[in-house]
């Protein structure tokens, strides 16, 4: 269904968590080896030959997954240590109550809470919501990215060591090709923009 309907508009819909066709939902299948990245790459190219930007954006995400694996291969400490070592000296907060509220989807921030509850119920969360929830943990609650990384590892059905580690370092600002550490996702504005319902 995604190849027929969602792929052509992937570049427009991939950041909209409320749309069923906005993502391929292939990440668990990739993680468990039911399908390979090469198969996904070639099938997406063949399934929608004339969709242009949708296929290009989708294949770009497949490449990001492979880039994370490449990064982990060359930096095996990725799950434990930031690539930008200065981040090891950040004075992270140890707040078990705030961390538990985040894990349970009880922060009071609708987009974060909906995503975290979805994660607990389904073992999956939309990528945009993963970024918002991750940014909230590290940049609003000031809780160490490793704690979020460990929670996602324990709860995601598509938990991939390379992607999980690289993504947490990206959202924190301490990884390779990261967003700037000073960029903070405003979870309220993100919710209004990407999932107003």
Model-derived segments and their meaning:
Residues 1-7:
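Long hydrophobic alpha-helical segments that form multi-pass transmembrane helix bundles
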Residues 8-197:
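C-terminal catalytic domain of photolyase/cryptochrome flavoproteins
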């Amino acid at each position: 269904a995604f190849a027929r309907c969602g792929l052509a508009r992937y570049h427009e819909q991939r950041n909209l968590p409320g749309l069923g066709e906005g993502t391929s939902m292939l990440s668990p299948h990739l993680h468990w080896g039911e399908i390979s990245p090469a198969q996904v790459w070639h099938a997406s190219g063949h399934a929608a030959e004339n969709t242009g930007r949708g296929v290009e954006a989708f294949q770009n995400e497949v490449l990001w997954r492979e880039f994370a694996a490449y990064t982990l291969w060359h930096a095996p400490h990725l799950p434990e240590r930031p690539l930008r070592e200065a981040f090891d000296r950040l004075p992270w907060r140890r707040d078990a109550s705030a961390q538990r509220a985040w894990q349970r989807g009880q922060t009071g921030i609708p987009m974060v809470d909906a995503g975290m509850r979805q994660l607990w119920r389904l073992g999956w969360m939309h990528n945009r919501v993963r970024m918002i929830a991750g940014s909230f943990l590290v940049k609003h609650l000031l809780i160490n990215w490793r704690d979020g990384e460990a929670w996602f590892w324990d709860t995601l059905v598509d938990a991939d060591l390379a992607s999980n580690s690289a993504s947490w370092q990206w959202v924190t600002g301490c990884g390779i090709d990261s967003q700037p550490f000073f960029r903070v996702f405003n979870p309220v504005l993100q919710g209004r923009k990407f999932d107003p319902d």
